[in-house]
């Protein structure tokens, strides 16, 4: 499936939901791309999981902001790769730093930068510990085993909609 066709499929999925997140946050390594940045060089040509680009462009087309929350000992390489992929300006926040603290620190910064409440965010990551920590903040979180794809994208939007409809969520908004 080509990028444009994947984007259209992602747009169709977005159209199934009355309530969308205000911000979708992605981890990088093994979520958007199938490698660790620290195992690469800035000279390398990065590549994404097959569905990632279409999903990101569909979100942007629907007016949903996107952000990055990533821990990496080589944030310079991660940022260079985003630039090579043409994504440098796509993200309203890029929290990429080498600290090995919890992802909750990334989300505190994203919240301060964007003003988006945690309950209005959807997060995709490949590590259980990140999902567990960030979900306690009220963010809808989806664990991805083999990168972000249309299936876990649909699941994320479904879970977000269910969380949004809960009485606890309505109080938070």
What label would you give each PLM region?
Residues 100-113:
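Short loop-to-alpha-helix "cap/lid" segments that border enzyme active sites
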Residues 19-21, 63, 118-120:
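A general structural motif
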Residues 15, 42-48, 79, 83-87, ...:
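Catalytic phosphate/metal-binding cores of nucleic-acid and nucleotide-processing enzymes, i.e., regions
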Residues 1-28, 39, 169-173:
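Non-catalytic pre-domain segments flanking phosphatase-related domains
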Residues 52-82, 94-100:
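Substrate-recognition element of Asp-dependent hydrolases with the DxDx(T/V) motif
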Residues 23, 29-50:
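Metal-dependent phosphoesterase signature
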Residues 87-92, 117:
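Conserved H-loop
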Residues 118-164:
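Acidic, Mg2+-coordinating phosphoryl-transfer loop and its flanking beta/alpha structural elements
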